[in-house]
Amino acid sequence: MDIESLANAVFDEIENEVNLTSKWKSTSKYARIRHLQIDKRGSFGERLLRDIFSKERNIALAYQDGDQGEWDIKINDIKIEVKTSSLDVNDKFQNEHIKNTPNCDFICFIGVAPDNLFMRLEKISEIDFSKLHNRGARGTGAGYKWDFKKEQMIEVKTREEVVALFYAEMGLDKKLIKKNLKSKQ
C-alpha cells in the first residue's frame, strides 16, 4: 500500500470527526474559503465584487488584482476597501488592518459563513475609530480591528441584493445615472 492511500484514509477519518464537531463541514457551500491563505481570502472578496459589478451597466468600474494601496475597487470614482473574513469559532467575522484614511470612501465587509454570505458597507468618514481596537497602539499589528456577528451584517443571496445595498449606502441613483448617460449622447 502506498503512502498516499494511507494519508487519504487518515484525512477521511479526521474530516469525518471535524464534520461532527464543526460548523464548517466539508460539504458546506463556502468551505473552500477555509483552504485559502488569508490574503487570498481577501482576493476572493475583491473578485466577487468585481464580478458582481462588472455585470452592472452604466457605471465606471476599476479593479486591479493585487495591492492598490488604500482601496481595492472603485465604482463611479467611489473608492472601496474590501475586507473578507470567514466565520470563526466564536461566531464572529474578524476584520483586521482597517485604516482611517481620507484616500478611501467606504469599507465593504464580506463575511463568509459555511452556507451564507453576509455584507456590510460603512462610510469611512462616519466610523467612530475610537470604539475600534487599535492594533498599533499595543504593538499587536497595524490598523484597527472590527468584529461583527452575523446579525450585524446583511445576508446577501443575489447579485441584485448586493448592487441594491451598494447603491443605497453610496447614495447612487441607478435611474439618474442612466438619465445622465442618455443626456450626454
Regions of interest found by a model, annotated:
Residues 1-78, 83-185:
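Nucleic-acid endonuclease domains
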